[in-house]
Amino acid sequence: MSYVIDRRLNGKNKSTVNRQRFLRRYRDHIKKAVEEAVSRRSITDMEHGEQISIPGRDIDEPVLHHGRGGKQTVVHPGNKEFTAGEHIARPPGGGGGRGPGKAGNSGEGMDEFVFQITQEEFLEFMFEDLELPNLVKRNLTGTDTFKTVRAGISNEGNPSRINIIRTLRSAHARRIALSGSSRAKLREVKEELARLKREEPDNFGDIQDLEAEIERLSARIHRVPFLDTFDLKYNLLVKQPNPSSKAVMFCLMDVSGSMTQATKDIAKRFFILLYLFLKRNYDKIDVVFIRHHTSAREVDEEEFFYSRETGGTIVSSALKLMQEIMAERYPSNEWNIYAAQASDGDNWNDDSPICRDILINQIMPFVQYYTYVEITPREHQALWYEYERIAEAFSDTFAQQQLVSAGDIYPVFRELFQRRLVT
């Protein structure tokens, strides 16, 4: 059997188009594997790609071979077993494969094809048909962190920072400046000596005087040092304020009796999006999970999403706990503070004004951005309208949106985190 397979080597990134075509061809397999990986992974475990397995029967390469179809009339000389007109059965095909049983001595099989997709490709399939905003990281004033940058040339510095090229250039210029007149005089004397030797070879007195002058000028030139401390040039490095690269994300979720499991799942997917955005913009991220009903508690991720604890609804308990944690562990001059709150909007009516006061006076002045998503198909209640007043006071750092179904998550996320033009 003859096979024709393209195995030509490709330079760096020259097979990108082929890889993209391959990903499009097996998009259903890859998307299914990514969905399974997302359900299996932790919210913070999005740092790598994923291994994708595709059944061997789906990835057969196009080949040229002798087909086994059709009928032929052939004369076989010396045949003693068959007569004209009889049909010869086809030889059986290979019986390779996998599964329990005894080993065979013939046939061929093919394992599943396994390949790795990158983190970028993983996120592309995870957020298919979506476009995460490219946000510019905000600089923090009063930061205590700095980075060292080049700031030109200095005449003083550490020997390890010497600029050899600039030093030699300076030394060459100094030597020319200090010995330029002597070199010009030396050239004139040498020309005169050459003329005398050519035209008046018997004039020994003048020739000796010129030779003595040449020695004197050469000695003067040689006394100019090749390198002087004045010539030394150093790379100047200065400290430049560097924005803090640490961020903390507070995830606040209502787990009262009115929050169904479907509502919690929508909240989880929103929190994953927010976490990935922060991870791409900051070197260090802390995630603080706060669950609340009538009271609030800081919990781990497992309990945050899967605990069955429930009760009434007092949203202010979560905001008070968040403010306490900020004061104890996350000073605003060192940390970029973000918050995402998810709720179905149900709250004790007398508590909604308290939530507004806590946010305006104790939280909003210290956070980079605060988002509130209300997951409900119903009309808004008192909490939403109190938060609207906060949005008016902090239009640049507070945003609220409504989610009705999982299909609303990504459009709402883009709306909340779209790039804003700075004027």
From Swiss-Prot:
Coiled coil: none
Pfam family, one: DUF444
Region listing for Disordered, in residue ranges: 83-108
Domain of life: Bacteria
InterPro entries: UPF0229 (IPR006698), vWFA_dom_sf (IPR036465)
Compositionally biased spans, kind Gly residues: 92-107
Family per similarity comment: Belongs to the UPF0229 family.
Record protein name field: UPF0229 protein Pfl01_5140
Species, as recorded: Pseudomonas fluorescens (strain Pf0-1)
